[in-house]
Regions:
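C-terminal compact regulatory domains
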Residues: 1-179
């Protein structure tokens, strides 16, 4: 259906009938990652179990996708809907192994939120891994993430393998340093 109002805008609604996808059993996360050049056996999924990750993402659909992905890997998550919320949540609880930070959000963007966390003086503010999770994939975007104080730059749509290896690398190191 299509609807349009002068000086108000247009709305378009499309309905498509698709069969429901099969659920992936919780213990079968490796098959969820199948495909690509990396064999499933090489994915360090065990490193992710029990990690605490702060997901900073304003888009509800993106939240749903990343939270479900992380849940399949046994990752505990907390959500912040914008950069200001992320700074506030970190001020309340610094016990995160990784922060996955979208960069383009309302209220406060991810670059500014990262700078605020890094400069906060809170425990682990300089060492907690902050990984950009963004659609910004142009030349210079990765450098901008690093300049803001982020440790890595993951582009959307998120590649499951890259996410797993990044969380294994950064989250495992953060856990070792906290103990």
């Amino acid at each position: 259906t299509v609807g349009s109002r002068v000086n108000k805008g247009s709305t378009f609604r499309v309905e498509l009938a698709f069969p429901l996808a099969e659920d992936v059993p919780p213990g079968d996360a490796g098959s969820f990652c199948s495909g690509g050049n990396v064999p499933d056996e090489s994915l360090p999924l065990g490193d992710l179990v029990g990690q605490r990750v702060l997901v900073v993402e304003d888009n509800e659909l993106n939240q749903y996708v990343i939270l479900n992905m992380l849940a399949r890997f046994g990752v505990e998550t907390c959500v912040a809907e914008n950069g200001r919320d992320a700074v506030d949540r970190y001020a309340e609880d610094q016990d995160f192994d990784v922060i996955l930070m979208d960069v383009q959000m309302p209220v406060m963007n991810g670059y500014d939120a990262t700078r605020r966390i890094r400069e906060s003086g809170l425990p682990r503010c300089r060492s907690v891994p902050i990984l950009a999770m963004t659609a910004h994939a142009m030349r210079g975007d990765e450098e901008r993430s690093f300049a803001a104080g982020m440790n890595a730059h993951l582009t959307k749509p998120i590649d499951v393998r890259e996410l797993v290896f990044s969380l294994s690398r950064w989250g495992s190191a953060a856990r070792r340093n906290r103990k």
